[in-house]
Regions:
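Conserved, structured core segments of small domains
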Residues: 1-80
Length: 80
């Protein structure tokens, strides 16, 4: 398993579509807290997920959201 950050960006008028799209998608990300910048005008959402591949990480998202999401493989390091 690898860890990924999923960074999604959408237009201000798409917030409702993004969040509603999860209702028809089975995902462990539903009903979980995550970081967003919608209320401050940024209209981005970030998730940190563990998955076997980039494709598996994107499958956690509804297609509409996944198509507007970048995936970055990350790891934790201790800052000296």
């Amino acid at each position: 398993m690898s860890r990924y950050v999923l960074q999604h960006h959408h237009a201000p008028d798409e917030c409702g579509v993004v969040f509603t799209s999860f209702k028809g998608h089975r995902s462990p990300l539903r009903h979980q807290m995550t970081l967003t910048s919608c209320r401050s005008g940024g209209h981005e959402v970030w998730w940190t997920v563990d998955a076997a591949s980039v494709q598996e990480a994107l499958r956690l998202l509804p297609r509409y959201v996944a198509e507007r999401t970048t995936v970055t493989r990350v790891s934790q390091v201790e800052i000296p």
